[in-house]
UniProtKB/Swiss-Prot annotation:
InterPro entries xrefs: ATPase_NBD (IPR043129), Gcp-like_dom (IPR000905), KAE1/TsaD (IPR017861), Peptidase_M22_CS (IPR017860), TsaD (IPR022450)
Catalytic reaction list: L-threonylcarbamoyladenylate + adenosine(37) in tRNA = N(6)-L-threonylcarbamoyladenosine(37) in tRNA + AMP + H(+)
Designated name of the protein: tRNA N6-adenosine threonylcarbamoyltransferase
Annotated source species: Anaeromyxobacter dehalogenans (strain 2CP-C)
UniProt binding sites for substrate: V135, V136, S137, G138, G139, D168, G181, D185, N274
Its job: Required for the formation of a threonylcarbamoyl group on adenosine at position 37 (t(6)A37) in tRNAs that read codons beginning with adenine. Is involved in the transfer of the threonylcarbamoyl moiety of threonylcarbamoyl-AMP (TC-AMP) to the N6 group of A37, together with TsaE and TsaB. TsaD likely plays a direct catalytic role in this reaction.
Length: 334
């Protein structure tokens, strides 16, 4: 039995969790900063870092209390050390280093993107390797071939804006509240996704990269020409914009799966909480015999520490250890 405490502070959530054997979350605590950043329309790095300083130890204490596991029952401390906002990452890294030293436990640094890729192992029915992983968030839109824990190969990524960024910037153009992706998803449920024709948000050719800047520009031109609509017309605009983003993600992911002969697709990252993306990916998988799609529960799509504990557990079992010189790496590539 392996029990790992993990800390996650890469952006605007302060999170801690205790996970057993990389499969069972004994606790999973998240302190969100949405209300703090809402007035600014997005995450303010300095405010995020300051709030992490205030919240990190209370969140860790709550995670330990909920799990019923004390420091003596832990096998290691894992922490997100990149990528992310450098100031935010440093808070979590310093806290984890201090706790590991005080408790005499091994320390493991975890890549945030790997955490997303393995979050599905906390679900009731986990995937099996190998699988194709689509990580979609505010800062990343990437396709990975996952052959085992710690064994990933980048297949394609966005050349400009991430899908989550396209949602958030689009929401700002429409005057919608932060977080923008959630607002668009909510309004789109009442709209017609075919009401407005947006350009395909894909890169031409056979490669597996993404591009969303043109789609965002198309929305800007539409708003400049027609203004921001209200009521049903706004719902139609949100649904059409969302559909263009989702279509690009699903088409690229399934193109990669067919070409590389993957039978399993795992959706991960905050945008994987989008209801239309979840439905579209599930529907597309049903069209292909032998193809399965794995989508974690919504709470495991957004930033959390349980997924970091899963990755940390398997890194620990591989013999990986971080020293006292572990530092934040905001540009750490998986």
């Amino acid at each position: 039995m392996t029990r790992v405490l993990a800390i996650e502070t890469s952006c605007d959530e302060t999170a801690a969790a205790v996970v057993e054997d990389g499969r069972r979350a004994l606790s999973d605590v998240v302190s969100t900063q949405i209300d703090i950043h809402r007035r600014w329309g997005g995450v303010v790095p300095e405010l995020a870092s300051r709030n992490h300083v205030v919240q990190v130890m209370p969140v860790v204490d709550e995670a330990l209390t909920r799990s019923g596991v004390g420091p003596e029952g832990l096998d290691a401390v894992a922490v997100t050390s990149g990528p992310g906002l450098v100031g935010a990452l440093l808070v979590g890294v310093q806290a984890a280093k201090a706790l590991a030293l005080a408790w005499g436990k091994p320390l493991v640094g975890v890549n945030h993107l790997e955490g997303h890729l393995v979050a599905a192992f906390l679900a009731e029915v986990p995937p099996a390797f190998p699988y194709l992983g689509l990580v979609v968030s505010g800062g990343h839109t990437s396709l990975y071939a996952a052959h085992g824990f710690g064994d990933y190969r980048l297949l394609g990524q966005t050349r400009d804006d991430a899908a989550g960024e396209a949602f958030d910037k689009g929401a700002k153009l429409l005057g919608l509240p932060y977080p923008g992706g959630v607002a668009i998803d909510r309004l789109a449920k009442e709209g017609d996704p075919a009401a407005i024709r947006f350009p395909k948000a894909i890169v031409k050719g056979a490669d597996l990269d993404f591009s969303f800047s043109g789609l965002k520009t198309a929305l800007l031109h539409h708003v400049k020409k027609h203004g921001v609509p209200e009521g049903p017309a706004l719902a139609d605009l949100c649904a059409s914009y969302q559909e263009a983003i989702v279509r690009a993600l699903v088409e690229k992911a399934f193109r990669a799966a067919r070409r590389l002969q993957f039978e399993r697709l795992v959706l991960a990252g905050g945008v994987a909480a989008n209801s239309r993306l979840r439905a579209a990916a599930t529907a597309r998988a049903a069209e292909y015999e032998g193809m399965s799609v794995f989508i974690p529960p919504v709470r495991l799509c957004t930033d959390n520490a349980a997924m970091i504990a899963v990755a940390g557990t398997h890194a620990l079992l591989r013999g990986e250890r971080a020293g006292p010189d572990l530092n934040a790496d905001p540009a750490w590539r998986l």
